[in-house]
């Protein structure tokens, strides 16, 4: 089935991609899960634990544990909401912002090097991004309907 092959093709690149990015993250003493949440906060700050859990499709306890490590490493700050004391807003610290910028640059260089070794056009990449975003939205909706 073509749909099965379609999904399997994305699953098969995931592990090799992680292996290529691991040295970059290790150099900066950050794990991949921490990086994904740090990047999410950078793109959506201020944000909350619940919003991160929803966007990343991870359980709140998992996100909470990762956030604790990021807080302990002085990469993010937590501020109570003025309207609702139960709600806490997360933002990057200056150290977190600096790390985000450095790791982004290193990862972008890696990604550009990989793409340069292929014959993928800009249009093909954009179409793939569009399709993956559509699928991501559907999967998030399905996951939250359970």
UniProtKB/Swiss-Prot annotation:
* Start and end residues of each HTH marR-type domain: 1-137
The Gene Ontology biological process terms listed for this entry are: response to stress
What is the scientific name of the source organism? Staphylococcus aureus (strain MRSA252)
UniProt KW DNA-binding keyword: yes
PANTHER family in the cross-refs = TRANSCRIPTIONAL REGULATOR, MARR FAMILY (PTHR33164), TRANSCRIPTIONAL REGULATORY PROTEIN (PTHR33164:SF44)
| PROSITE patterns listed in its UniProt record | HTH_MARR_1, HTH_MARR_2
Q: Which Pfam families match?
A: MarR (PF01047)
Could you identify this protein by its name?
Uncharacterized HTH-type transcriptional regulator SAR2349
- Can you provide one Gene Ontology molecular function annotated for this UniProt record? DNA-binding transcription factor activity
> What keyword terms does UniProt attach to this protein?
DNA-binding, Transcription, Transcription regulation
Q: Which domain of life is it from?
A: Bacteria
Could you tell me which InterPro entries the record lists for this protein? HTH_MarR-typ, MarR/SlyA-like, Tscrpt_reg_MarR-type_CS, WH-like_DNA-bd_sf, WH_DNA-bd_sf
Q: Where is the signal peptide?
A: none
């Amino acid at each position: 089935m073509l749909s099965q092959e379609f999904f399997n093709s994305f699953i098969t690149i995931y592990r090799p991609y992680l292996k290529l990015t691991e040295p970059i993250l290790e150099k900066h003493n950050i794990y991949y899960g921490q990086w994904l949440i740090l990047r999410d906060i950078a793109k959506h700050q201020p944000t909350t634990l619940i919003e991160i859990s929803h966007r990343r499709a991870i359980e709140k306890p998992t996100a909470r544990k990762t956030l604790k490590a990021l807080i302990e490493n002085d990469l993010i700050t937590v501020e109570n909401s003025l309207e609702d004391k139960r709600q806490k807003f997360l933002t990057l610290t200056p150290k977190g912002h600096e790390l985000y910028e450095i790791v982004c640059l290193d990862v972008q260089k890696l990604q550009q090097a990989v793409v340069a070794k292929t014959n993928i056009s800009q249009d093909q990449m954009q179409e793939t991004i569009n399709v993956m975003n559509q699928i991501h939205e559907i999967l998030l909706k399905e996951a939250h309907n359970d």
